Amino acid sequence: MNQQDLKNAVEKRRTFAIISHPDAGKTTITEQLLLFGGVVREAGTVKARKSGNYAKSDWMEIEKKRGISVTSSVMQFDYAGKRINILDTPGHEDFSEDTYRTLMAVDSAVMVIDSAKGIEPQTKKLFQICKMRGIPIFTFMNKLDRDGREPLDLVNELEEVLGVEAYPMNWPIGMGKGLAGLYDIYNNRIELHTDEPEFLELNADGELKESNPIEEESVFQDAMMEVSLMKEAGNQFDEAKIATGELTPVFFGSALTNFGVKTFLDAYLQYAPAPTSHKDEAGEEIEPTEEEFSGFVFKIQANMNPNHRDRIAFLRICSGEFDRGMDVTLNRTGKTLRLSNSTQFMADTRENVETAVAGDIIGLYDTGNFQIGDTIYAGKHAIQFEKLPQFTPELFMQVSAKNVMKQKSFHKGIKQLVQEGAVQLYTNYTTGDYILGAVGQLQFEVFQFRMQNEYNSEVVMQPMGKKTARWIDPEQLDEKMSSSRNLLVKDRYGQPLFLFENQFAERWFAGKYPDVKLTAKL
């Protein structure tokens, strides 16, 4: 691929994550987008879950049973001349680590909000991560088919709670059973709420070109008045502010009834960025159109295909072109690897990928070479992208195999699930017992379920409660420092740390050993 072809291919890519609070409709809107891409023939619904027709992006057994996304799925499709990569992030708050890493691999985000509830805690947390990265955020106010909060309240809340300017691209004409349509500010038309797509044209003043019965409805008159108010007193549309994440375009609609979703997708593709540069550890920007291939591993997933017990490393391509069978260097080890087995995803289905370019997400079959955060490159110049953030756990549990005769599957399961970041592993410095660390309780439940379901290994979990993890320099360590209030353990890399039972125990330790330096992260 020559330089111009590479540039054209990269320009067509749109790679984004969908973020939301649980039950805001994230999976449903993902389904509708896949429908437009021709990937699925019908979108799943909440009711369909009970009949066994699960959402396409929820592939893991526990996700199907509980109706929550606990891993980040990757889906790719073509639409309107663009190659779209969607990363469907975990909606449950316990999976912030996986979500955070996923948000490092995208160029923009779509924030789905339940219009009956407004901004919820998980939405706020995920928004702040996107804002910190300075990536564009597009807002979809979902569930317009149900009665919800006043649209003006929702837009005001965006600005006041999240501290971002908002610009409505369309406006509801009624809601719930009284939903008559959408005033499409972006396309200067009315989108009627009918079984088949139907539009009414507006003149330059934003009024109907031809008379229509909808004019007599009070919801239409209210919408016209609110739109007029926003045009006078609201924010101005500003592409530059969208690009930096300072202004979020707001779309109203219903993912469940597929109303307003296509309008959103078309506008998103026009204003969302193509792949952007990534910084290496030296602070140098690696441009996506650079000829030399590079990328980083942001996720590892074991057992995506239970029949093969495989392990996939998810790679965000940052520059250049990927060709199957190419040789690359793994920066962490300096080892040369041949990328012969590569794949692209549609939840649990996949196909071999021959070529891909910057912006694409591909899966590499992994026999144990990769770790989360690894950089690979194909050029002569070594590249190491900025490290992905690690979260320090607050909840801990001691874990052991229920059946001592199944130690092999127990150890294999723990090794693989820890490598993919499902939980963090520690070892008691004295006894060698395994201790798991997690951000939230659900991570332990998922771990226990997957150990039994995927590795046929029942585990015994003993709660240790909340702890504060603090690392210590090995040269300052004395094993006598350990006590019941500050348990000495090793992390998976062999580095020593203490698990303090509370802040009082930590202060007591600091008073007794004033010269010992403790750190919150390795």
From Swiss-Prot:
Q: Which domain of life is it from?
A: Bacteria
Name the keywords, alphabetized.
Cytoplasm, GTP-binding, Nucleotide-binding, Protein biosynthesis
> For this chain's UniProt record, which GO biological process terms are given?
regulation of translational termination
Q: Which InterPro entries match?
A: EF-G-like_DII, EFG_III/V, G_TR_CS, P-loop_NTPase, PrfC, RF3_C, RF3_dom_3_sf, RF3_GTP-bd
Q: What is this protein called?
A: Peptide chain release factor 3
| Residue ranges occupied by any tr-type G domain in the UniProt entry | 11-276
The UniProt entry's sequence similarity note says:
Belongs to the TRAFAC class translation factor GTPase superfamily. Classic translation factor GTPase family. PrfC subfamily.
Q: SUPFAM superfamilies of this UniProt entry?
A: EF-G C-terminal domain-like, P-loop containing nucleoside triphosphate hydrolases, Translation proteins
Q: Where in the cell is it found?
A: Cytoplasm
For the ligand (GTP), the binding residues are 20-27, 88-92, 142-145
Q: Which CDD domains match?
A: RF3, RF3_II, RF3_III
User: What Pfam families does the record point to?
Assistant: EF-G_D2, GTP_EFTU, RF3_C
Q: Which GO terms describe its molecular function?
A: GTP binding; GTPase activity; translation release factor activity, codon nonspecific; translation release factor activity, codon specific
The entry's function note states:
Increases the formation of ribosomal termination complexes and stimulates activities of RF-1 and RF-2. It binds guanine nucleotides and has strong preference for UGA stop codons. It may interact directly with the ribosome. The stimulation of RF-1 and RF-2 is significantly reduced by GTP and GDP, but not by GMP.
Q: What is its main location?
A: cytoplasm
Q: What high-level taxonomic lineage is stated for the organism?
A: Bacteria, Bacillati, Bacillota, Bacilli, Lactobacillales
Q: Which GO terms describe its cellular component?
A: cytosol
